[in-house]
Swiss-Prot record:
Identification of the protein by name: Large ribosomal subunit protein uL1
MF terms in GO: rRNA binding; structural constituent of ribosome; tRNA binding
Quaternary structure, from the entry: Part of the 50S ribosomal subunit.
Pfam families, per the entry: Ribosomal_L1
Function: Binds directly to 23S rRNA. The L1 stalk is quite mobile in the ribosome, and is involved in E site tRNA release.
One term under GO cellular component: cytosolic large ribosomal subunit
Lineage: Bacteria, Pseudomonadati, Campylobacterota, Epsilonproteobacteria, Campylobacterales
Swiss-Prot/TrEMBL GO biological process terms: regulation of translation; translation
Keywords: Repressor, Ribonucleoprotein, Ribosomal protein, RNA-binding, rRNA-binding, Translation regulation, tRNA-binding
rRNA-binding among keywords: yes
InterPro entries: Ribosom_uL1_bac-type, Ribosomal_uL1, Ribosomal_uL1-like, Ribosomal_uL1/biogenesis, Ribosomal_uL1_3-a/b-sand, Ribosomal_uL1_CS
UniProt family annotation: Belongs to the universal ribosomal protein uL1 family.
Length: 234
């Protein structure tokens, strides 16, 4: 880390009380004061959940469409044929194809952020699963990316859909907007995300579901959030 970056980070640390547990409103106000990069930084949330994902009944996975969007331009690809391919093109998909498109992906050509597929073509998609899986691009019914309603899936993807999945340690990370967003927009996005996380609480999860939570920017220190306030969001 360069001296310039170290000095900048040290200055940001002075703006965050490391001993304080912030309310969501306080955290959003504070995180907006931490913008220091030369680009529009992403507001990120990190959660530690009281689940053991090694057990199938404790896997937390899903998606939510953020009210204010993500602030990102999303390239959407769709694997579909015939009428569904036409529907995808009309809905604004950036790439639409089937066998030829899958062959391109198999060669390592991945120039999209979200991949949607119709259920009848998932056998085709399975051939490139080893390439898509590690990149988090594999279509899945739980995130609404395996569907016959391709138009709605495209609308969601371009309109601010965020997918989430707990990792092996019980952590979930997500970008929930840009620091340039208004305080109300960020509050709305974070609340919508947390409500969906709470909705996906496994029945097998006992005790405090959200063990810890923190808010930060792409290049800032983190701000500790009050877990109980988040768990109360329904």
């Amino acid at each position: 880390m360069s001296k310039k970056v170290t000095k900048r980070f040290s200055e940001l640390l002075k703006k965050v009380d490391s001993d304080k547990i912030y309310t969501l409103d306080e955290a959003v106000s504070t995180v907006k004061t931490l913008a220091s990069a030369k680009f529009d930084e992403t507001v990120e949330i990190a959660l530690k959940l009281n689940v053991d994902p090694r057990h199938a009944d404790q896997m937390v996975r899903g998606s939510v469409v953020l009210p204010a969007g993500t602030g990102k331009t999303v390239r959407v690809a769709v694997i579909a044929k015939d009428a569904k391919a036409d529907e995808a093109k009309a809905a604004g998909a950036d790439i639409v194809g089937a066998e030829d498109f899958v062959d391109e992906i198999a060669k390592g050509v991945i120039n999209f952020d979200v991949l949607i597929a119709t259920p009848n073509l998932m056998g085709l998609v399975g051939k490139i699963g080893r390439l898509l899986g590690p990149k988090g691009l594999m279509p899945n019914p739980k995130t609404g990316t395996v569907t016959m309603d391709v138009a709605q899936a495209i609308k969601n993807a371009k309109g601010g859909q965020v997918n989430f999945r707990v990792d092996k340690q019980g952590n979930i990370h997500a970008g929930l907007g840009k620091v340039s967003f208004s305080k109300d927009q960020l509050n709305d996005n974070i609340s919508a995300f947390i409500k969906m996380i709470n909705k996906h609480k496994p029945a097998a999860s006992k005790g405090r579901y959200i063990k810890s939570a923190a808010l930060s920017l792409t290049m800032s220190p983190s701000i500790t959030l009050e877990p109980q306030e988040l768990m109360d969001l329904k």
